[in-house]
Regions:
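Charge-dense, helix-prone N-terminal extensions
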Residues: 2-146
């Protein structure tokens, strides 16, 4: 027995555009060293959507560093994570570590626990630069204590 590697793993975990899809139905992204590689491995329209969201974060979260952490793109201020992109089979999540505290009159942020929140981006049309800029401004203030 090879521990589920090879043909047996392919039967248990069919692939979907660079993802392995376990029984839970949520794809597991292959490990990528860079954000470019992560986004580049996504199928369309997720690739275009993730790239559009990434451009907004880069423009609107000044001074942030970005890297692959926890197997997906994460933007941090200093050592504190602020936001992330995480691909699923039919959408890309733009999430915020302190997102549950973000004022969101649009109702698009979904809380995921007591602290975090995310929005699901199904297409590039879901990327709203002005709305996301406001969320990123609030996330910066929450992260830096301002």
């Amino acid at each position: 027995m090879n521990g589920g590697v090879g043909a047996e793993a392919a039967t248990l975990y069919p692939t979907f555009g660079g993802f392995a899809v376990p029984r839970s139905g949520e794809p597991e992204m292959e490990k990528h060293a860079t954000i470019d590689a992560y986004i580049g491995a996504l199928p369309e329209p997720l690739r275009e959507t993730a790239e559009a969201a990434r451009r907004v974060v880069h423009r609107r979260l000044e001074g942030a560093t970005s890297a692959i952490k926890w197997s997906h793109p994460v933007w941090s201020l200093g050592t504190a994570p602020v936001c992330y992109l995480k691909a699923a089979s039919e959408h890309v999540r733009l999430g915020f570590w302190r997102g549950a505290s973000i004022d969101d009159p649009s109702g698009r942020l979904e809380t995921s626990g007591q602290v975090t929140a995310h929005t699901k981006l199904r297409s590039v049309e879901d990327v709203d630069e002005e709305l996301f800029a406001d969320w990123l401004r609030q996330a910066r203030e929450l992260t830096l204590g301002g």
